Amino acid sequence: MIEDNKENKDHSSERGRVTLIFSLKNEVGGLIKALKIFQENHVNLLHIESRKSKRRNSEFEIFVDCDINREQLNDIFPLLKSHTTVLSVDSPDQLPEKEDVMETVPWFPKKISDLDFCANRVLLYGSELDADHPGFKDNVYRRRRKYFAELAMNYKHGDPIPKIEFTEEEIKTWGTIFRELNKLYPTHACREYLRNLPLLSKYCGYREDNVPQLEDVSNFLKERTGFSIRPVAGYLSPRDFLSGLAFRVFHCTQYVRHSSDPLYTPEPDTCHELLGHVPLLAEPSFAQFSQEIGLASLGASEETVQKLATCYFFTVEFGLCKQDGQLRVFGAGLLSSISELRHALSGHAKVKPFDPKVACKQECLITSFQDVYFVSESFEDAKEKMREFAKTVKRPFGVKYNPYTQSIQVLRDSKSITSAMNELRHDLDVVNDALARVSRWPSV
């Protein structure tokens, strides 16, 4: 990423010939993946050749001459690094060099299809299970998990989510969870959750005898809030997961927990995702709250991402709110756990007002009840507090989501900021025009 030079001229569109040398691992399709990056970013290749690497016998080195501008080079460089080892970049004088204040900024997706590069970096579980996992000794369950993992790993942006023929055992497990949780929702869940759950039953097949299909749920959410579902094999890193939220994409597991203990899972399964998260992702205010946490994480330091992820944990996963003078639950981890849902509103749980500066320092517990739960006055209250907290994130740029192109606008110079202001000015003109029309016809 390139900043303006001292003359305040924008050279990002000036073109030049650049030679890149990168090494490929000896794997099927490695070169195709690398060349696709150039194609998708509209970079013209002038010459390409390959040779056996002199550094390692198992790798090949690729020489590429291309006609490229500085902005394109900034876009493809981190993408290449995710698939290859970039050994050399020869940038001639005619491609203007400018001070790069963003060299140390961690890579983040700029367009929604970039999520293909990070959605498969599963940290935990997936097709592999720990020895203490309920399904570790069940070979049939392990094969089933491998099947779901392969589906998620092969998924690319734009693909329809594969429809699943769930087994009788999986449907029974889902049914037990669905039935028991629905006994608690009327007295424990927030009103927004209760408003959306019947719609999911009507349009997505939320029933005791049916596990909803992620494709149906994704289409429903797109119409409600612009969110979509992307299948994932298991736990992602906080950075990769939050990056998806910035694009209103929710990474969602498709497997069902082991049937030996329907009321417990050491990991997020599709029961947790569908019953815990989805009803509130259909709520506009909550959807915006989730996206803003994701946007704040883009390009942030590891320390900041961890703080944002912890705030997400104590709101989106385990958050409480006040409604009609009573505590109600909006956290997905609670809304998908019978025992902890009861505990959180039992009067015995420790609760504190939600403050991001406090919540981000609280330890997140995975296999036991939380030591403390944080209470927000409303989604809007939580959103405003997170906005103030996001202002403390140290980045040499701002970001803005463009819903038309499903891409991130990086606001880092006068040109990009002016462009964003012009878009806002147009939106304000539309609103002002509407106000003027309404004032002329007050009965409308």
UniProtKB/Swiss-Prot annotation:
<dbReference type="GO" id="GO:0043005">
    <property type="term" value="C:neuron projection"/>
</dbReference>
<feature type="binding site">
    <location>
        <position position="366"/>
    </location>
    <ligand>
        <name>L-tryptophan</name>
    </ligand>
</feature>
<dbReference type="InterPro" id="IPR036951">
    <property type="entry name" value="ArAA_hydroxylase_sf"/>
</dbReference>
<keyword id="KW-0724">Serotonin biosynthesis</keyword>
<keyword id="KW-0832">Ubl conjugation</keyword>
<keyword id="KW-0560">Oxidoreductase</keyword>
<dbReference type="GO" id="GO:0006587">
    <property type="term" value="P:serotonin biosynthetic process from tryptophan"/>
</dbReference>
<dbReference type="InterPro" id="IPR036329">
    <property type="entry name" value="Aro-AA_hydroxylase_C_sf"/>
</dbReference>
<feature type="binding site">
    <location>
        <position position="265"/>
    </location>
    <ligand>
        <name>L-tryptophan</name>
    </ligand>
</feature>
<dbReference type="InterPro" id="IPR041904">
    <property type="entry name" value="TrpOH_cat"/>
</dbReference>
<dbReference type="GO" id="GO:0060749">
    <property type="term" value="P:mammary gland alveolus development"/>
</dbReference>
<dbReference type="GO" id="GO:0035902">
    <property type="term" value="P:response to immobilization stress"/>
</dbReference>
<feature type="binding site">
    <location>
        <position position="257"/>
    </location>
    <ligand>
        <name>L-tryptophan</name>
    </ligand>
</feature>
<dbReference type="GO" id="GO:0042427">
    <property type="term" value="P:serotonin biosynthetic process"/>
</dbReference>
<comment type="similarity">
    <text>Belongs to the biopterin-dependent aromatic amino acid hydroxylase family.</text>
</comment>
<dbReference type="GO" id="GO:1900046">
    <property type="term" value="P:regulation of hemostasis"/>
</dbReference>
<dbReference type="InterPro" id="IPR019774">
    <property type="entry name" value="Aromatic-AA_hydroxylase_C"/>
</dbReference>
<feature type="binding site">
    <location>
        <position position="277"/>
    </location>
    <ligand>
        <name>Fe cation</name>
    </ligand>
</feature>
<dbReference type="GO" id="GO:0045600">
    <property type="term" value="P:positive regulation of fat cell differentiation"/>
</dbReference>
<feature type="domain" description="ACT">
    <location>
        <begin position="19"/>
        <end position="94"/>
    </location>
</feature>
<dbReference type="InterPro" id="IPR001273">
    <property type="entry name" value="ArAA_hydroxylase"/>
</dbReference>
<feature type="binding site">
    <location>
        <position position="336"/>
    </location>
    <ligand>
        <name>L-tryptophan</name>
    </ligand>
</feature>
<dbReference type="Pfam" id="PF01842">
    <property type="entry name" value="ACT"/>
</dbReference>
<feature type="binding site">
    <location>
        <position position="235"/>
    </location>
    <ligand>
        <name>L-tryptophan</name>
    </ligand>
</feature>
<comment type="function">
    <text>Oxidizes L-tryptophan to 5-hydroxy-l-tryptophan in the rate-determining step of serotonin biosynthesis.</text>
</comment>
<dbReference type="Pfam" id="PF00351">
    <property type="entry name" value="Biopterin_H"/>
</dbReference>
<dbReference type="InterPro" id="IPR005963">
    <property type="entry name" value="Trp_5_mOase"/>
</dbReference>
<dbReference type="InterPro" id="IPR019773">
    <property type="entry name" value="Tyrosine_3-monooxygenase-like"/>
</dbReference>
<keyword id="KW-0408">Iron</keyword>
<keyword id="KW-0597">Phosphoprotein</keyword>
<dbReference type="GO" id="GO:0005506">
    <property type="term" value="F:iron ion binding"/>
</dbReference>
<comment type="subunit">
    <text>Homotetramer. Interacts with DNAJC12.</text>
</comment>
<dbReference type="InterPro" id="IPR018301">
    <property type="entry name" value="ArAA_hydroxylase_Fe/CU_BS"/>
</dbReference>
<protein>
    <recommendedName>
        <fullName>Tryptophan 5-hydroxylase 1</fullName>
        <ecNumber>1.14.16.4</ecNumber>
    </recommendedName>
</protein>
<comment type="pathway">
    <text>Aromatic compound metabolism; serotonin biosynthesis; serotonin from L-tryptophan: step 1/2.</text>
</comment>
<dbReference type="InterPro" id="IPR002912">
    <property type="entry name" value="ACT_dom"/>
</dbReference>
<dbReference type="GO" id="GO:0007623">
    <property type="term" value="P:circadian rhythm"/>
</dbReference>
<dbReference type="GO" id="GO:0005737">
    <property type="term" value="C:cytoplasm"/>
</dbReference>
<feature type="binding site">
    <location>
        <position position="317"/>
    </location>
    <ligand>
        <name>Fe cation</name>
    </ligand>
</feature>
<keyword id="KW-0503">Monooxygenase</keyword>
<dbReference type="InterPro" id="IPR045865">
    <property type="entry name" value="ACT-like_dom_sf"/>
</dbReference>
<feature type="binding site">
    <location>
        <position position="272"/>
    </location>
    <ligand>
        <name>Fe cation</name>
    </ligand>
</feature>
